[in-house]
Amino acid sequence: MKFANIFALEHLLTLGAYLFCIGFYGLITSQNMIKALMCLELVLNAVNINFVTFSNYFDTQHIKGEIFVLFIMAIAAAEAAIGLAIVLTIYRDRKSIRIDQFNLLK
């Protein structure tokens, strides 16, 4: 059974849009750096859902959307590892991971 036959296009695009909006809202309103990283991952997953959806509905002969998703997942994993390492370093130095207390220009 193909993925395209299970869900309607509108449902998957709506799911991707909701996840993107929730992640973006969380990204711009979060005060915690770890929460901001999690919201950024949610935004990237919404983009992945849209890539796979468009690939399955409009480009059934090729797997270009899935290849883009693999690249995005690899970049997201590296981004999460580097981001968490930066957060850990900032916590060791400042004893806080709140974004409003974080200013390297001092």
Swiss-Prot record:
Keywords: Chloroplast, Membrane, NAD, NADP, Plastid, Plastoquinone, Quinone, Thylakoid, Translocase, Transmembrane, Transmembrane helix, Transport. Its EC number is 7.1.1.-. It is a multi-pass membrane protein. GO terms for molecular function: oxidoreductase activity, acting on NAD(P)H, quinone or similar compound as acceptor; quinone binding. It catalyses: a plastoquinone + NADH + (n+1) H(+)(in) = a plastoquinol + NAD(+) + n H(+)(out); a plastoquinone + NADPH + (n+1) H(+)(in) = a plastoquinol + NADP(+) + n H(+)(out). It is found in: Plastid, Chloroplast thylakoid membrane. NDH shuttles electrons from NAD(P)H:plastoquinone, via FMN and iron-sulfur (Fe-S) centers, to quinones in the photosynthetic chain and possibly in a chloroplast respiratory chain. The immediate electron acceptor for the enzyme in this species is believed to be plastoquinone. Couples the redox reaction to proton translocation, and thus conserves the redox energy in a proton gradient. This is NAD(P)H-quinone oxidoreductase subunit 4L, chloroplastic. It comes from Psilotum nudum. The gene is ndhE.
